[in-house]
UniProtKB/Swiss-Prot annotation:
A matching Pfam family: EF_assoc_2
Keyword Chloroplast recorded: no
Amino acids binding GTP 2: 514-521, 550-554, 620-623
Enzyme Commission (EC) number: 3.6.5.-
A molecular function (GO) term: GTPase activity
Residues in the Cytoplasmic compartment per record: 1-692
Gene3D superfamilies the record matches: EF-hand, P-loop containing nucleotide triphosphate hydrolases
Domain of life assignment: Eukaryota
Keyword Transmembrane helix in annotation: yes
Organism of origin: Candida albicans (strain SC5314 / ATCC MYA-2876)
Record topology, Mitochondrial intermembrane segments: 714-716
Protein name from the UniProt record: Mitochondrial Rho GTPase 1
InterPro entries for this protein: EF-hand-dom_pair (IPR011992), EF_Hand_1_Ca_BS (IPR018247), EF_hand_assoc_1 (IPR013566), EF_hand_assoc_2 (IPR013567), EF_hand_dom (IPR002048), Miro (IPR021181), Miro-EF-hand_domain (IPR052266), MIRO_dom (IPR020860)
One GO cellular component term: ERMES complex
Amino acid sequence: MSPDAIRVVVCGDDAVGKSSLITSLIKETIIEPQTNNVLPPITISRNDYIESSQEYLNDQDHHHHHQSSPSTMKNKRKHNNKRERERERESSINNVQPNEISEYIPNITTIIDTSSSDMTNLQKELKRADVIWLVYSDHYTYERISLHWMPLFRSMGVNLPIILCANKSDLFPKSKSNLKSTNSDEFVPLINEFKEIEAGVRCSAKNNYNVVEAFYLCQRAVTHPISPIFDAKEGNLKPGAIKPLKRIFWLSDTDQDGYLNFEELSELHKKCFGIEASKSDYEEIVNLIDQKILPSYNTTIETQTPPQQQHLATSAGTPNGTTTTTSKGISEDGFILLNKIYAESGRHETVWCILRAYHYTNSLSLSDKFLYPRLDVNPHSSVELSPTGYKFFVDLFIKFDKDNDGGLNEDELNTLFRSTPGIPKLWVESNFPSSIVCNEEGYVTLQGWLAQWNLTTFLSYKTTLEYLAYLGFDEGNSTKALKVTKPRKIRQKNGKTYRNAVNDRNVFNCFIVGAPKAGKSSLLESFLHGSYSDIYSPTIQPRLVVKDIELRGGKQCYLILEELGELEPAILENKSRLDQCDVICYAYDSSDPESFQYLVELREKHGHLLDEVPAVFVALKADLDKQQQRCDVQPENYTRDLFLNSPLHVSLAWNSSLHEMFIQLVDAAKTPSSATPGIELEVSVDQDDIKHIIMTGAAIAVVGLVSIWVLNSLRR
């Protein structure tokens, strides 16, 4: 992962060699610029830089006798004290694999030369910069780093990564040990004092020494910044980095035993670095953690690890301090420690490779493209779970039903949603789990679990996509878990508008309207649980329930029932909400003579919108004495005038009548022409039916003609 372009602004006092470093990088030989002559901006493309970078890294491997393992997650270096860690941090590029370098390089890198005497231009360039290459060359210019340059950057509000460059190293003694000591003595105080400084490197523009490394470190400071993930002063990973790493561990721990075994770590390694980890890789990682937590008596360390921290190691310690691998694997704390080792030793590319494999950005938040991938949905289409989506949520349910009781209790749900921001807001608004089928203990059943996700996908497919990402959907693009139905077509007949039949949908939405005390809430309860309460409680806020039902022929679908509550008038005036509704259930109390008049007045007020939505009239409480309705027209006559079926008499005590009502609601939603007010059945034949009739007639005619021809042939 790399940005399209970055700007490197080279700063420092006059005569420290800023322009010489740039020319040495470009020409691989020093060209003495004229005094106070600032170079024009230099643009380096990705392709220009890859080859030279690979050659540089290969040379570094040769000179340092360093053989990197193919396993990116491995780190063979031991850090015995803080100074050594800082030295390793300075030369960490030696651990970068040549075949990985291209991943770090932006498409275009622009290098901007500056002059300390032209403060106006310097400030302008700093505000456009992505990283600062800060150069000094002697003790005086070194002191001005903390006395002048860093205060200047902070006073300007510039919060950019800074790479320190000690130029003109050819003027220092040739001793390698003395050079390393000088590096540590110079860089460590500045790195500890100023969090903006990410690394320091000693260079020589004259000898072309470490110039490419310094330039690479500038790029790396942008593509793989250390500051978001590691606190150099505290020597620990930052909380903002620990949180996503814990989520990655949780997703990788497929058996949910709290440890990464060899198979799980190998899969994590393959996802992050493209190759599976070998058994020796795994053992070396475990040993690396063990040596950090439970060092042997032969290992030189700063402080002995307290016994209470030994659980971080995934291996058992032997009496003499050596460690052996157990079958459990790497714990969560051990995984965090492993990444801390990488970060503090300058291997933060490895940490970023892990984070970015799981779609984290530089701000350590999940990428919007990952959370909300593009899905083209026609305004007249709906979105449902695909077979892949069903399988994912079924597997997720089984995985977290730890006690195998067929239900997810509160603890199991909390564990399941650990890698997410929590239960979706939409679920809270729909009073989950009261919106679905639960078992006697109130635990979420698989039936209810799938129904809730169908409800979520129907109402807000973006929420489903978001949570698929959070929950670790790993079948490529999360849109594979969803399917978009065909757009709903609108037809007209005799000036009346109605919806065309649908045959590719499995989720249908039904509004239930009716007078207070008509039995709407009890109907929802019976739909879910097969029982209801006699205690009346008015519905204030809209209420949703969802459940799968079996249709004629054995096919199953999901039916969403929505009681609108006090928002009923507003919702029925909202065309976009009505477009989401597949059928309206007009319910009245057949034992209350005033109940049906409410529906008549409701349709008179909102009829211009309601007439386009399929309708089913239902007479509830049919087990009680039927009463003559006190309105101008009786229910049977009213529905006949609308060319609708007579009200279906339903009692919550009669399960068969309830099931028949739900089937009729789905039938009306699937074949709107049969239940749209004002549409006569005989004039609303579907286009597909006409085609079938024509084709059948044509087939009969062909058969007849063939029969006559055969008969005539026989007579001859």
